[in-house]
């Protein structure tokens, strides 16, 4: 049996995608709509309060295209906290006008494919901790997609030796390093949590960088032979102070 990769696991992750029911929201009187949006704003302020204690983070984005209008990405130390947050959101009046279109449950993950040998506790390494328990960059643009490692009769990632996988992941990672300073990447593991094995969340100031890195990686052996992908979601940051304008009709 091939050796399984070990992982370092950080905060639990929940991507929530919603479409806005604009026809129904249009029937709401302006005064009521303003109160509904303010209640949503207060909810987001409460989510943000954990940042000061470094107990999680969240990001809010306006998704481009018809797959969704809004993405709320939440990170917390415990999965149960994600349940509580989603429940609280569902109880808000704004939820009457938000139609769930997709969600993704996972956990911030680092693998040991590229790790060197050390007796150090990785969870005490400041660089590792910053990646497992991140402060999100809130860049202008976001891209999210789920993915699997292919396993079929021709190409099966899980039948490769650890050495083969390490070599492939090293080459794969070298492409990613070319985009340092242009793209911030977060990998979340979802085996046993959701329909795919990983989620990939990218942040950038220029959305064209998403196209460039994904296209370049198509020619990498790790992706070309062993990568299967779900839907891609891309969007622009939705500052909370602009919510009233966003929901105004």
Curated annotation (Swiss-Prot):
Involved in coproporphyrin-dependent heme b biosynthesis. Catalyzes the decarboxylation of Fe-coproporphyrin III (coproheme) to heme b (protoheme IX), the last step of the pathway. The reaction occurs in a stepwise manner with a three-propionate intermediate. It comes from Staphylococcus carnosus (strain TM300). Its cofactor is Fe-coproporphyrin III. The keyword Metal-binding applies. HAMAP family: Coproheme_decarbox_1. Fe-coproporphyrin III binds at residues 131, 145-149, 172, 185. The gene is chdC. One of its GO terms (biological process) is heme B biosynthetic process. It holds the Pfam family Chlor_dismutase. Pathway: Porphyrin-containing compound metabolism; protoheme biosynthesis. Its EC number is 1.3.98.5. The lineage of its organism: Bacteria, Bacillati, Bacillota, Bacilli, Bacillales. One of its GO terms (molecular function) is peroxidase activity. PANTHER family: COPROHEME DECARBOXYLASE (PTHR36843:SF1), HEME-DEPENDENT PEROXIDASE YWFI-RELATED (PTHR36843). The active site is at 145. This is Coproheme decarboxylase. It catalyses: Fe-coproporphyrin III + 2 H2O2 + 2 H(+) = heme b + 2 CO2 + 4 H2O; Fe-coproporphyrin III + H2O2 + H(+) = harderoheme III + CO2 + 2 H2O; harderoheme III + H2O2 + H(+) = heme b + CO2 + 2 H2O. Keywords: Heme, Heme biosynthesis, Iron, Metal-binding, Oxidoreductase. Gene3D superfamilies: Apc35880, domain 1. The keyword Oxidoreductase applies.
